[in-house]
């Protein structure tokens, strides 16, 4: 009996001791978070200090009575992390402080985070050297320190992190060589630093974009100067001397050289004669200024602005039988009077190169400005081309870019549109990230989504088969007041399928096999991706879209299931948004519904437009830019 009583007392004692230990550990976590709060400022850190448990605080996640995750992305945090703060959260597995304004070094007591798996600190202003202790953490899987101010060398002990699959160090101030890294990494980027030297052979299989913006050499970049493609220096000091007999030329060799020179001279004269005849013919054709196509610019770089004057195109023919046609066919003349010669002589500026052709800004002397699209790979005959263009020219909507005129010949197909001064939504979302850039606020983004939805809904209302065919952010153009207008509508059927965009661009619906045959439900999918891009700030074509290599819709779905919808939003959007983002989440869910895997599960564009109108109206009237 006494034995049973002693056993019961022991069990009770152990249980009480366990509760006390758990309470003590949670209190230790609470003190650590308060230390962070005292050093770091930001809206989410207005935690309820009266609560005994930190597990209900914003961004804090607990498991078994301990803090296991701290997620405060894009929360406007600033200041430096203290010793005795995060480093004392010894059960922490996930730390996400990305896209804030935190500065200073990474605290040395991060070495205590032996269970840490995921470290996301990108998009801050952390400085100092990258501590080597990060690569001694036994559980670490992903490290993202991109877009900070880290300096010094990449630690030599990277290979100590045996479970590491992601290492992002781009856009810092790192210097020196890249150490040999033999880990089976799945994601890697050190671009836009001050690194130098040869790229280790273990990293040579990564794309150029992982290393650009440094002074590195070796695969996949240019060959290092010390390396010789032939394996040695030709004609170097170790080259054996030739025999003396080779210094003397035989009579046969001399005769061969003379004959070769004579033949070469005759060929040169023949070429000069042909060039002179061609030049005389071209002098009879009026000189024209024509823009030369340029390579497509990336979404993260500014498109170069330059005027290029080249040899005029071949003589324009108005039909495939060869009849001359120098006339533009106009749909709208309210933009101003001009003819083909005037258009080709106008001051031209390269805007970019897309999937259907190159675009230029044409400025006339009298002040008129238009946009010209030079189509490429047109595969339909003239009659079908003209019929198609007349259908497009008859369309009129406030959110469609106006098709002013077109020109058709065997060698040239030109479309003339109204010019949109603010450029494309893609350039604004993913272009210059400098201090002078003004980000789009919520009201403006909602207005852009609504304008684009109305335009596409109008296209679909023409009949049951009319679709846009190429919806993406670079085809959403903006006016001075940030009014959205949709461009490149209805052109997919007349362009070669090899030129039409494919699924790699991130907007294409999964059921599409022929890029020239896009259904209205496929348009809805592409528009859904556009909404997600507008709210997350992530390009669907970005290589580092997320850390699993999935497309944008699946990434949004995955994050919202594991965390909260707010975790996927563009930090530039949440930073300037007042408390409460219910309408943002509503629009995000509309975008997700549009990207349903099966076409029948997607709403119609009319329904999408109605839903966005409700969101927009409950948000108030749009303002163009953030305060």
From Swiss-Prot:
ATP binds at residues 351-359, 373. It comes from the Eukaryota. Residues 1-23 form the signal peptide. Its main location: membrane. Keywords: ATP-binding, Leucine-rich repeat, Membrane, Nucleotide-binding, Phosphoprotein, Receptor, Repeat, Signal, Transmembrane, Transmembrane helix. InterPro entries: At_inactive_RLKs, Kinase-like_dom_sf, Leu-rich_rpt, LRR_dom_sf, LRR_N_plant-typ, Prot_kinase_dom. GO terms for molecular function: ATP binding; protein kinase activity. Pfam families: LRR_1, LRR_8, LRRNT_2, Pkinase. One of its GO terms (cellular component) is cytosol. PROSITE patterns: PROTEIN_KINASE_DOM. Belongs to the protein kinase superfamily. Ser/Thr protein kinase family. This is Probable inactive receptor kinase At3g02880.
């Amino acid at each position: 009996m006494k034995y049973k009583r002693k056993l019961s007392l022991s069990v009770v004692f152990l249980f009480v001791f366990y509760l006390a230990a758990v309470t003590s550990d949670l209190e230790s976590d609470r003190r650590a978070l308060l230390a962070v709060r005292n050093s770091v400022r930001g809206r989410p850190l207005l935690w309820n200090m009266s609560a005994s448990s930190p597990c209900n605080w914003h961004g804090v996640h607990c498991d078994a009575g301990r803090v296991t995750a701290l997620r405060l992305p894009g929360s406007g945090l600033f200041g430096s992390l203290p010793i005795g703060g995060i480093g004392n959260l010894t059960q922490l597995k996930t730390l996400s402080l990305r896209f804030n304004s935190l500065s200073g070094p990474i605290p040395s007591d991060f070495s205590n985070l032996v269970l840490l798996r995921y470290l996301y600190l990108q998009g801050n202003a952390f400085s100092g050297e990258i501590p080597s202790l990060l690569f001694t953490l036994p559980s670490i899987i992903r490290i993202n320190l991109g877009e900070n101010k880290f300096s010094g060398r990449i630690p030599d002990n990277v290979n100590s992190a045996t479970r590491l699959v992601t290492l992002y160090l781009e856009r810092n101030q790192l210097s020196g060589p890249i150490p040999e890294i033999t880990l089976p990494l799945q994601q890697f980027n050190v671009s836009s630093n001050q690194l130098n030297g040869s790229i280790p052979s273990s990293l040579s299989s990564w794309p150029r974009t992982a290393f650009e913006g440094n002074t590195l050499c070796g695969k996949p970049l240019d060959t290092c100067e010390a390396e010789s493609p032939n394996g040695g220096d030709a004609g170097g000091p170790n080259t054996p001397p030739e025999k003396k007999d080779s210094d003397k030329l035989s009579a046969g060799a001399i005769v061969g050289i003379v004959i070769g020179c004579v033949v070469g001279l005759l060929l040169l004269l023949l070429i000069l004669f042909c060039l002179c005849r061609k030049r005389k013919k071209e002098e009879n054709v009026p000189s024209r200024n024509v823009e030369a196509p340029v390579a497509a610019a990336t979404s993260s770089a500014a498109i170069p602005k330059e005027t290029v004057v080249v040899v005029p195109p071949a003589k324009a023919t108005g039909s495939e039988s060869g009849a001359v046609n120098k006339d533009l066919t106009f749909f709208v003349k309210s933009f101003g009077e001009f003819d083909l010669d005037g258009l080709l002589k106008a001051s031209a500026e390269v805007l970019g190169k897309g999937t259907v052709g190159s675009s230029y800004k044409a400025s006339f002397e009298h002040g008129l400005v238009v946009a010209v699209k030079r189509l490429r790979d047109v595969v339909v005959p003239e009659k079908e081309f003209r019929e198609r263009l007349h259908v497009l020219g008859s369309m009129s909507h406030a959110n469609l870019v106006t098709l002013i005129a077109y020109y058709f010949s065997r060698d040239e197909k030109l479309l003339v549109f109204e010019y949109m001064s603010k450029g494309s939504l893609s350039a604004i979302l993913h272009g210059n990230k400098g201090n002078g850039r003004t980000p789009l606020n919520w009201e403006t983004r909602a207005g852009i989504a609504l304008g684009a939805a109305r335009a596409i809904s109008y296209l679909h209302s023409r009949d049951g088969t009319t679709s846009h065919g190429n919806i993406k952010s670079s085809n959403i153009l903006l006016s001075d007041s940030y009014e959205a207008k949709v461009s490149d509508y209805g052109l997919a059927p007349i362009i070669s399928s090899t030129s039409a965009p494919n699924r790699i661009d991130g907007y294409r619906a999964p059921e599409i096999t022929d890029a020239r045959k896009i259904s209205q439900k496929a348009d809805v999918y592409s528009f859904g991706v556009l909404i997600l891009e507008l709210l997350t700030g992530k390009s669907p074509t970005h290589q580092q879209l997320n850390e699993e290599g999935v497309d944008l819709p699946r990434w949004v779905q995955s994050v919202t299931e594991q965390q909260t919808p707010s975790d996927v939003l563009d930090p530039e959007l949440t930073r300037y948004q007042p408390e409460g983002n219910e309408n943002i989440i509503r629009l995000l869910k509309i975008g997700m519904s549009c990207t349903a895997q099966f076409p029948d599960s997607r709403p119609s564009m009319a329904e999408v437009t109605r839903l966005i109108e409700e969101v927009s109206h409950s948000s108030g009237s749009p303002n163009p830019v953030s305060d």
